[in-house]
């Protein structure tokens, strides 16, 4: 099979596949089923066997980190591993709505990174990102960045990043300290596009999340009810936007999911887009789509015209 296209993750210099793997669906809580050992092995080894070399997770994702450690520690040299910090130190079983608030104190940042290292059975993380887009003032008051940089000096973290969104994202970029930004972006969610470009021009690597919006645009609306309540409003808004905009003439035989993924890969500023699934068949389909590369330039431009930035 043809190799996946790759890109340099900004100033990190890491050569990452343009299709990455988002491991949230391994969480095993919050409406996500707990995978058996066989299921976990199939999906995670399938990720690496399919050529993907970038895996993103978080302590907030239930059992995700633990499962990655169990299944992939023996293949650690084959992939780049990204996680988050500032997350509450909790048992994986605690549901989202019962978890403690995020805490960006130096002590909690360090405790979280060290917990991630233990869970994933590794002595370093390639990228650690602050989760849930904390305000710049919070990071400065807590001296949070200094703690991540200390962990970097110790060799436990290679590069630091921000999982950021509007309205804080512009401030995060202006701080000038982040090697990587993880930002939501898709055909139906383009409001961060200018900031993505700004961050890329400043030399940061760009990790896209939500590039296919979990396929909620084309599924029965009742499927959205199966997701945690905190995800549902955004999913409904994206589905509504998709349903009211006709692009059938642009699909050229592709499924909407395929088109969405190739649209995301077509953004010239992106380094990798993380797509999650616990289904090996869906994983294989995602790999096959990514192998096709970006959309033709004229199709990409027309899709942008039909889904303008609000």
Question: What is each model feature region?
Answer:
Residues 24-26, 58-60, 84-88, 130-133, ...:
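Active-site beta-loop-alpha junctions enriched in small/polar residues
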Residues 9, 21, 47, 55, ...:
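Conserved, mostly hydrophobic/aromatic
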Residues 48, 53, 194-310:
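Structured C-terminal cap/extension of enzyme domains
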Residues 77, 174-182, 200-206, 269-270:
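Glycine-enriched alpha-helix->loop->beta-strand junction motifs that scaffold or abut catalytic
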Residues 78-81, 178-186, 292-300:
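Short hydrophobic/aromatic-enriched beta-strand-loop microsegments
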Residues 45, 92-187, 194, 266:
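Glycine/proline-rich, positively charged
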Residues 1-83:
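N-terminal binding-site loop/beta-alpha segment at the start of enzyme catalytic domains
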Residues 53-59, 158-161, 180-183, 272-274:
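Short catalytic-loop micro-motif centered on adjacent basic/acidic residues
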């Amino acid at each position: 099979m043809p190799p996946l296209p790759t890109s340099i993750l900004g100033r990190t210099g890491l050569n990452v596949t343009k299709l990455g793997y988002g491991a949230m669906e391994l969480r095993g809580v919050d409406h996500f089923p707990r995978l058996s050992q066989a299921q976990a092995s199939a999906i995670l080894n399938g990720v690496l066997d399919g050529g993907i070399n970038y895996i993103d997770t978080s302590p907030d994702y239930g059992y995700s980190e633990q499962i990655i450690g169990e299944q992939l520690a023996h293949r650690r040299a084959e992939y780049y591993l990204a996680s988050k910090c500032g997350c509450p130190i909790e048992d994986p079983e605690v549901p989202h709505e019962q978890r403690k608030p995020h805490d960006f104190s130096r002590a909690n940042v360090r405790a979280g990174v060290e917990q991630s290292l233990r869970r994933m059975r590794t002595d370093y993380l390639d990228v650690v990102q602050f989760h849930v887009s904390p305000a710049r003032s919070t990071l400065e008051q807590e001296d949070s960045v200094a703690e991540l940089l200390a962990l970097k000096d110790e060799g436990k973290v290679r590069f630091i990043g921000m999982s950021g969104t509007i309205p804080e994202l512009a401030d995060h970029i202006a701080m000038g300290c982040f090697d990587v930004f993880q930002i939501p972006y898709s055909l139906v969610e383009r409001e961060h596009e200018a900031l993505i470009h700004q961050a890329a021009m400043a030399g940061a690597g760009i990790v896209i999340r939500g590039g296919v919006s979990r396929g909620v645009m084309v599924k029965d609306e009742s499927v959205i009810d199966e997701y945690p309540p905190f995800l549902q409003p955004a999913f409904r808004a994206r589905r509504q936007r998709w349903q009211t905009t006709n692009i059938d003439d642009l699909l050229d035989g592709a499924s909407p999911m395929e088109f969405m993924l190739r649209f995301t890969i077509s953004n010239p500023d992106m380094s990798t887009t993380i797509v999650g699934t616990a289904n090996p068949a869906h994983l294989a389909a995602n790999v096959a789509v990514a192998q096709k590369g970006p959309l033709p330039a004229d199709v990409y431009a027309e899709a942008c015209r039909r889904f303008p930035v609000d």
